[in-house]
């Protein structure tokens, strides 16, 4: 890759973020309080969607999305060969088989051509 490595673990946390976390931790609820539906409503509005569902992790969100799409046994999902394990696991949780597509060495992403090749192998 010609670009510097993406600082995957680096976080950008503001004072407003810290105050929001303190407010939740000092409140009566951690996971079922008013912050969750407020976040879902704000997120839905930000992406112009009628609804949004907060998940505890991207793994859970991928699993939920594939399940909502009806992915199940007999289906094949293609993931890039460079990815976090949850990408493939979410498809397996739904019963689908998983294939992997090579990635472009410059971008680190699968391309239409590598996707086509992976689909032929599937």
Place the predicted regions along the sequence by residue.
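PLP-dependent aminotransferase-like
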Residues: 67-122
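Conserved PLP-binding active-site segment in aminotransferase class I/II-type PLP enzymes
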Residues: 1-68, 72, 94, 116
């Amino acid at each position: 890759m010609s670009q510097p490595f993406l600082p995957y673990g680096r976080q950008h946390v503001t004072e407003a973020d810290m105050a929001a976390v303190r407010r939740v931790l000092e409140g009566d609820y951690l996971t079922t309080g008013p912050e969750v539906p407020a976040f879902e409503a704000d997120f839905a509005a930000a992406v112009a969607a009628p609804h949004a569902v907060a998940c505890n992790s991207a793994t859970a969100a991928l699993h939920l999305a594939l399940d909502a799409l009806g992915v199940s046994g007999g289906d094949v999902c293609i993931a890039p060969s460079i990815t976090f394990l949850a990408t493939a696991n979410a498809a397996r949780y739904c019963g689908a088989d998983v294939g992997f597509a090579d990635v472009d060495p410059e971008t680190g992403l699968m391309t239409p051509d590598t996707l086509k090749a992976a689909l032929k192998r599937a």
